[in-house]
Amino acid sequence: MEDYAENSFNVIPISMEYIRDLRTATSFRVYVIYIDLVLILALFLSIHAIRELTSKQLFSKSITHLLIASLVYGNVHNASYTIIETWSLYRSFAYSDNMTAIMFTSEECFVQHVLNSCVRFLFIAIELALNVDRIIVILFRKHFHCYPGVRGEILNILAVILSFALGCLLHLKGPHPGIVTTSCFRETDITINLCSTNLTSYTILSACCAALDFLMMWYTWNDRKKINYDLNSQYLKVEQHHSLMAVSLNSLLQLFVTSIYAISMFVLANMSMTNPELGNANLLRWFYTTPYSTLLVPIQIKVFIQWIGNRRKRRINTATRVSLTQDGYFTKLSDSWK
């Protein structure tokens, strides 16, 4: 977890001219309008994906429940982020000549800091819940159909508790007097301060989730090759393989897009030591990739639903052709004895 040392939040002297340029820059205003449009698009795609998940039973009830929760929490995060940035945009117009009012203080942003931190952790925690559900399915394959809906709800609740507990734990010291920021998204963003971004905890959670995804994919890929003469067990194994691979790929791609933000922050923090302009708030915004991740998730779900559905159709068509061939063979054999 982050080391909130006393010198982590030193007040950085910034000229009024620099603040005016930062807060009224066209790049900042264009970004807010652009990201709001991205988040609206993500909302519409998520609604469509949720309808697909509820109408087509291609995943178990627990996985379906957690995938829907992932879509919902992604859009909750987007709503929180949109409110924060749009509020900042409003101030950049309303107080363009008041350099004190145009900035945000740590005290007025504290609730938003905590909420946004919790929701970002929840975005990763729900992926961990999906991993736990897949582990349960693998370990108890013959009984995975027992209480799948309840299992999904329990894992969902645990993910919420974990993320909000971690988010609140990282803000136990409360607001930091004297600190100002361009929006309520980060506790300090005039220059990069990695001690105030929760990146360490965020990166650890993402890395653990990605490692579990790779493990699940490796196991299910090798497990499908094992011969099983129980037709029902073999069918369940194939169905679980398709759904688990789809969910793992979805989670990995989502985490990859999200991790770009963490990597960029570390890189820009080092580069800004020699060139401070590489650490200013307007540049940092463009590297926040979680909104793109929430845009990607419903698209991925739609693709995987189509993929699994097509594979099922091919399997059914193959089985039907074999059945007709066998019927024709025995009909001809019967006729030959007449």
Curated annotation (Swiss-Prot):
The keyword Transmembrane helix applies. It is a multi-pass membrane protein. Keywords: Membrane, Transmembrane, Transmembrane helix. Its main location: membrane. GO terms for cellular component: membrane. Pfam families: 7TM_GPCR_Sra (PF02117). One of its GO terms (molecular function) is olfactory receptor activity. One of its GO terms (biological process) is detection of chemical stimulus involved in sensory perception. It is found in: Membrane. Belongs to the nematode receptor-like protein sra family. This is Serpentine receptor class alpha-32.
